[in-house]
Amino acid sequence: MTNSSSSKKQAQDQPETSEPTLKSLKTKMTKSDEKQKKLKDIEISVPIVYGNVAFWLGKKASEYQSHKWAVYVRGATNEDISVVVKKVVFQLHSSFNSPTRVIEEPPFEVSESGWGEFEIAMTLHFHSDVCDKPLSLYHHLKLYPEDESGPLTMKKPVVVESYDEIVFPDPSESFLARVQNHPALTFPRLPSGYNLPAPMQVEDTGKKKRGDTKDHSLGQWFMSFSEADELLQLAAARQQVQAHIAKLRRQISLLEGQNQTVKTGSDL
């Protein structure tokens, strides 16, 4: 499964995942340290994407080294999320050397190679003024395309990503002052008459290491997530539900008609 172990342990028996689709979630976190001053009726949202990109090795592929892959957590718009996320802990399959990988700066990702698909746990730890409890995410590493009848190709990787929106209710004043106007975060309309705290002094962005993924080497393969995408999928799902309801109503009407016919015949 790995390039650092000769173990022949089979990959965990996991169900196949679907083609890359928008899985829209909204995860509401618990409040941060109660000692900090809270801003009531305000929520800060951080849209994130997590998943993997996998490349088949072609002629270089072997029985235990068929793919190179990367698993990651990134901002949904490829902005730097380290303003909120302090570190990410990736838990790989036990057959890897050092299966627990701690990434303390962006990009929050792990690159490896191997042959098997398995579930990867990702634990996000936040800065102390954000939230004192971590968030656990789970991703099934996908190496092979859904269409198994077609030939494998080195030109296009397998990409599987999921979207989540982490919501922090009643943020601390220091948190809001530190991150306001940051492009990786979204803020709802503030209550009437509410004044934002003064922005916190930050270091020179020109000297700070760039933490976004806009120029990432895998960026061309990243999926695009937006509210428009979500609305389109919700509309499509609603149409499917309505069509299913209409079909059930027709079936019920047909059954009721048959029952009425049988009842009329028995009364003769």
UniProtKB/Swiss-Prot annotation:
This is Transcription initiation factor TFIID subunit 14b. The gene is TAF14B. It comes from the Eukaryota. Its main location: cytoplasm. Residues 1-20 have a biased composition (Polar residues). It is found in: Cytoplasm; Nucleus. The keyword Protein transport does not apply. Residues 1-36 are annotated as: Disordered. PROSITE patterns: YEATS. Belongs to the YAF9 family. Expressed in roots, leaves, inflorescence and flowering tissues. Keywords: Activator, Chromatin regulator, Coiled coil, Cytoplasm, Developmental protein, Differentiation, DNA damage, DNA repair, Flowering, Nucleus, Transcription, Transcription regulation. Negative regulator of flowering controlling the H4K5 acetylation levels in the FLC and FT chromatin. Positively regulates FLC expression. Component of the transcription factor IID (TFIID) complex that is essential for mediating regulation of RNA polymerase transcription. Component of the SWR1 complex which mediates the ATP-dependent exchange of histone H2A for the H2A variant HZT1 leading to transcriptional regulation of selected genes by chromatin remodeling. The keyword RNA-binding does not apply. GO terms for biological process: cell differentiation; chromatin organization; DNA repair; flower development; regulation of DNA-templated transcription; regulation of flower development; regulation of photoperiodism, flowering; regulation of timing of transition from vegetative to reproductive phase. Residues 38-182 form the YEATS domain. Disruption phenotype: No visible phenotype, due to the redundancy with TAF14. Modest early flowering. Taf14 and taf14b double mutants show a pleiotropic phenotype that includes small size and abnormal leaf morphology. Taf14 and taf14b double mutants show a reduced H4K5 acetylation in the promoter region of major flowering regulator genes including FLC, CO and SOC1, and a more pronounced early flowering. Component of the TFIID complex. TFIID is composed of TATA binding protein (TBP) and a number of TBP-associated factors (TAFs) whose MWs range from 14-217 kDa. Interacts with TAF1, TAF4B and TAF12B. Component of the SWR1 chromatin-remodeling complex. Interacts with FLX, a component of the transcription activator complex FRI-C. Interacts with SWC4, and with EAF1A and EAF1B (via HSA domain). Pfam families: YEATS (PF03366). GO terms for cellular component: cytoplasm; NuA4 histone acetyltransferase complex; nucleus; Swr1 complex. Residues 229-263 form a coiled coil.
